[in-house]
Amino acid sequence: MGRHSDNSLQESANHTVLLTSPTNTIPKDSRQRSQQFMQNLQDEICTALEQLDGKASFHQDHWERAEGGEGRTRVIREGRVFEQGGVNFSAVWGNSLPASILAQRPEAAGHEFFATGTSMVLHPRNPYVPTVHLNYRYFEAGPIWWFGGGADLTPYYAFKEDAVHFHQTLKNACDVHNPEYYPTFKRWCDEYFYLRHREEQRGIGGIFFDYQDASGKLYVESQTDSSVAIYSQKVGNVARNWEDIFAFVQSCGQAFLPAYLPIVERRQGIEYGDRQRNFQLYRRGRYVEFNLVYDRGTVFGLQTKGRTESILMSLPPLARWEYCYEPEAGSPEAELTEVFLQPRDWV
């Protein structure tokens, strides 16, 4: 990992400090601290993944954004374990807010913005090893701020113990901060990673959250009758400040490696053939569809004129589509979509 530049990226100018109430105050060093955490998370994940793969290494591209900001894109390809994967870090700022942000938070209009985050997608070679996604981010626009993120698992073959392990590890990280975090954000994850045009879940979920700030609301979306909306209404508002939520996000980020690596180690040696490989490529097509149609990070990146190669690094190197494909009844492939991907309480 020594070839990776660890020079700290510069914090943007004109950092607004909010002084309205103790619970909603933005620390003076909020941008520096959030940015540093995202960089460190990228470093830790890349180091561990290289050690696990044992063959391939991450290639880094450092890029700059003309409107303000820069980042580090790291891609691993043709490895022993990982066919392709990427771990991105970025910190961007500017005066023009993208439409995707204004649609959700119109009160941010008129303010310069700052956004930093780390995102990751790994596409393993072996179909028995699940694809995994992680994203944690922080956003500021004048007095408006929030954290978002999560991690989710997309298996191609059903292993209950893997799903339980992944969810339990994330739940443990959440429970340290609030026992209502996991049940709320698990439901939100099931809602978010859903392909409406296919009426299918993308995977077995994990946790997902967005717009987490001092307002106290755990679920911040327009739906009022979904499972997560109803659950969040029962929970009510949760008193938190910037430091509370930042600590929670750090715990979630640090839970990724113990949540995912044991699964890879259990499954990477299982033998597979053309049938399993073809099904993996077919299901990867669903991943492509979600990321290009629904993913907020993709939309935000393209609307803010981010680096296109970095934004689309989440896509797999190979995928396939087959007209009106139907898996054989009773097969492991049929079990995945008919049974295993249906939302449930894993822990």
UniProtKB/Swiss-Prot annotation:
It catalyses: coproporphyrinogen III + O2 + 2 H(+) = protoporphyrinogen IX + 2 CO2 + 2 H2O. GO terms for cellular component: cytoplasm. Transmembrane segments: none annotated. InterPro entries: Coprogen_oxidase_aer, Coprogen_oxidase_aer_sf, Coprogen_oxidase_CS. Pathway: Porphyrin-containing compound metabolism; protoporphyrin-IX biosynthesis; protoporphyrinogen-IX from coproporphyrinogen-III (O2 route): step 1/1. The keyword Oxidoreductase applies. Keywords: Cytoplasm, Oxidoreductase, Porphyrin biosynthesis. It comes from the Bacteria. The keyword Secreted does not apply. One of its GO terms (molecular function) is coproporphyrinogen oxidase activity. It holds the Pfam family Coprogen_oxidas. The record marks H197 as: Important for dimerization. Residues 1-31 are annotated as: Disordered. Its main location: cytoplasm. Residues 75-84, 287-322 are annotated as: Important for dimerization. Its EC number is 1.3.3.3. GO terms for biological process: chlorophyll biosynthetic process; protoporphyrinogen IX biosynthetic process. It is an enzyme of class 1 (oxidoreductase). It is found in: Cytoplasm. Homodimer. Belongs to the aerobic coproporphyrinogen-III oxidase family. Key enzyme in heme biosynthesis. Catalyzes the oxidative decarboxylation of propionic acid side chains of rings A and B of coproporphyrinogen III. This is Coproporphyrinogen-III oxidase, aerobic 2.
